[in-house]
């Protein structure tokens, strides 16, 4: 396993982050694994040297956090880097169980800690931007969470670059904890983040940990076969992203061509491309099988030339912004 410093924190994380959205309960999504199946993957991840785990309170309505915490309880907590997220409403009867008000952050972070069975997380992220709450209130609540010891660092997820810049400016102006990571939507068939967000993160020393590095599975198999997966058959959200627009199909075909040429999988080529991008610290890889996890880790050993990178990128065309919802 390779490790890297996460942004400007000084904290070392594995270059593959295990995404835990697929762990918890199939009552939430049909493709989600139960606890025993999830445990097998998490334990194998640790065997492979992965020390970085990302979950969220909304995944399986909290079950993902509980499952992750139960498995990690059998290991040395000091050797783990655990990240979770909050924003989306957790209880339909409680309007304060979502959003980024002080009340919501305090209660939902504590609920996450309770489910994880931990006193602190290493990284607490806002899952989206909250138009209803002043960013000053959100940042002060997060600053207090760091001072209380509930989290060591704070991060953010998909939003407009102008919003992220405003948050970083407010942290500096008011001497508050600043976001040290950006978990954004970024992969070979969705590169709109290269226009503003990624240069901003590079300038500010913010670590980048992209979600959906394999484009919800679109980059793991020929594009005409994507709909045949369990996720493809059951998740409408998959089709809300513009992967099939612009140059998506041709990029998919070039990934397949290069994978065949190098004797590796399409997923490994797509991950290797991300791992070769200087502004990416660790892509967040979700999986439902040990085999796919092992493939992802092997992507670290794949070398792509400048010509390979250019060949994969050349068909890309601008697409609609996606992932800020």
Where are these regions (language model features)?
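N-terminal binding-site loop/beta-alpha segment at the start of enzyme catalytic domains
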Residues: 1-80
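Acidic (Asp/Glu)-rich catalytic clusters
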Residues: 8, 71-79, 113-117, 146, ...
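Conserved beta-strand positions
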Residues: 18, 55, 84, 123-126, ...
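Active-site mouth loops of central-metabolism enzymes
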Residues: 23-36, 91-103, 127-132
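Short, acidic/polar
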Residues: 32-45, 100-116, 164-168
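Structural motif corresponding to the early beta-alpha repeats
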Residues: 75-100
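Active-site groove signature of glycoside hydrolases
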Residues: 113-132
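Beta/alpha (TIM)-barrel catalytic core signal, keyed to glycine-rich beta->alpha loops juxtaposed to Asp/Glu
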Residues: 130-314
